[in-house]
Amino acid sequence: MTDTRIVVQRFVDHFLAGRIIEGLSILNEDGVYTIIGTTPASGVYRGRQDLFDRLLPSLQTFAAPPVFTVSEIIVEKDRAVVLASSNGEGPYGPYIQPHYAFVTRVAGDGFAEVIEFNDTVAVEKALYGRQFVKA
């Protein structure tokens, strides 16, 4: 069994190097990846292939892919939390994520589970062109 910190560091290294697809590939074949919120990208992805089939089209729209900064990695047994931020350019404008949290559970050489917390308004505006007005 691979050490949790090693798996998480591999994920972080890929994201920091701009290799987001390779980072997401660490999800086990039968792993579950959840993106919080109600954006078109939000939801539960069951398995690596489902994640790629449904999320990759949105990721491929970036004019400038997000550049990540990791502020902290917290590891406890098979669980880890990665705190990060990113800046990029979506098809509709700047993509600024001041706070990400990736809550993970490692099994074997990959992730059995990832829950991604992010600023959903940033996703809606930069990736889908949605503007928000007061009700």
Predicted regions and their residues:
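Residue-level detector of alpha-helix boundaries and kinks
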Residues: 7-8, 36, 40, 89
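A solvent-exposed, acidic/Ser-Thr-rich amphipathic alpha-helical stretch
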Residues: 21, 28-77
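A beta-strand edge to alpha-helix "cap/lid" segment located at domain peripheries
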Residues: 3, 56-135
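Hydrophobic pocket/interface hotspot
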Residues: 11, 22-27, 31, 47, ...
